[in-house]
UniProtKB/Swiss-Prot annotation:
One of the primary rRNA binding proteins, it binds directly to 16S rRNA central domain where it helps coordinate assembly of the platform of the 30S subunit. Part of the 30S ribosomal subunit. Contacts proteins S5 and S12. GO terms for cellular component: ribonucleoprotein complex; ribosome. One of its GO terms (biological process) is translation. Belongs to the universal ribosomal protein uS8 family. It comes from Mycoplasmopsis synoviae (strain 53). Keywords: Ribonucleoprotein, Ribosomal protein, RNA-binding, rRNA-binding. It comes from the Bacteria. One of its GO terms (molecular function) is rRNA binding. This is Small ribosomal subunit protein uS8.
Length: 132
């Protein structure tokens, strides 16, 4: 299956699994997807992730979602920059998600990072997604 936007596929799979209260979700692997999942893990929205499979074509990300009782750690996740409409911001214009309670995942010249890291490094870039 050919995907025009693999990042949106990642976000939708996590969102759907989260809404259905699944413990884990399986996602086709790519280095960029793995970097995004790593940031989500570091921010505390998922419990863990692992890379399954040995061949490049068989690799999958196995993401374990995080719950506190019946409440999910992820309240919402939204794709911002899309292939048809890219969203770029300068370092001074980086938005705060829910007044700082959420996280903005950005692709910068220094790699993928959160909004807090981008402000600290004083770099702008493309806004990939919001998560809260």
């Amino acid at each position: 299956m050919f995907l025009t936007d693999p990042i949106s596929d990642l976000i939708v799979r996590i969102k759907n699994a989260n809404q259905r209260k699944h413990k884990t979700v399986e996602i086709p692997h790519s280095n960029k997807k793995e970097a995004i999942v790593k940031l989500i893990k570091e921010e505390g929205y998922i419990s863990s992730y692992s890379v399954e499979g040995s061949k490049k074509t068989d690799k999958r990300l196995l993401v374990t979602l995080k719950y506190k009782g019946k409440q999910s750690a992820i309240v919402g996740i939204k794709r911002v920059s899309k292939p048809g409409l890219r969203v770029y911001v300068k370092s001074e214009e980086i938005p705060k998600v829910l007044s700082g309670y959420g996280t903005c995942i950005m692709s910068t010249s220094k790699g993928l990072m959160t909004d807090k890291e981008a402000r600290k490094a004083n770099v702008g870039g493309e806004i990939i997604a919001f998560i809260w």
